[in-house]
Amino acid sequence: MKILNLYSGVGGNRKLWGDEYEVTAVEIEQYIADAYKELNTNDEVVVADAHQYLIENFQKFDIIWSSPPCPSHSRTSTSLSGWGVFRYPDMKLYEEIIFLKHFFKGNFVVENVIPYYETLVKPTIEIDRHLFWSNFPITPLKVERNYDVSRATKEVLSEHHGIILPEKTKDKRKLLRNCVTPTVGLHILNCAVGDFNKNFEPQTLFGNEM
């Protein structure tokens, strides 16, 4: 089964997936891609614009996970306005949801933060601090956390996620804050794979050339 992991970051969502799947990760920042590769040595890692990579390659995969950048959607945007900083919400989020819903024949999930505005497309589910849009059912999951994410140190975040970044990686706290909790990533993948196996034959959906 082939999985595409877009805007992969250092791979919080992917940490517990194991090695039974063929995973391709796409990350635009080289230093982040390097950290991901060191943590997930069996994955193919592509340094590229994930949004463009998606439209050019979506037919090669059985399952797609996309986590478009969240800052322009987050509630911090309203706080920044008090400092005279204004920004448009990045519509790539909704472009990908709509595109995948209408043109992708496998299973997909798009993840983002809970926004400061009413969502333009109704999400499938809210888990932890995130919303998820998918074309398969996702069952509820409660995430236990004994710290404030906004104030947590990189050490606390590293322990929570079970991710130890390579020593020379910069922006460790930021990268760890951006991670989807690994147990959430595994839960959603299991939902996607279970639904996929009921409805499709892996790696034949788009032809044998994959």
Describe the residue ranges of each PLM region:
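Solvent-exposed polar/charged
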Residues: 19, 38, 66, 99-102
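Generic enzyme active-site microenvironment
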Residues: 3, 25, 65, 109-110
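Glycine-rich His-Gly loop
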Residues: 8-9, 66-68
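Class I S-adenosyl-L-methionine
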Residues: 53-63, 70-210
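Short, charged low-complexity linear motifs
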Residues: 1-3, 21-22, 113-120
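Short N-terminal signal/transit or membrane-insertion segments
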Residues: 1-9, 84-91
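Short glycine-rich, polar/acidic loop-and-turn segments at beta strand-coil junctions
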Residues: 29-30, 68-70
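SAM cofactor-binding core of SAM-dependent methyltransferases
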Residues: 2-54
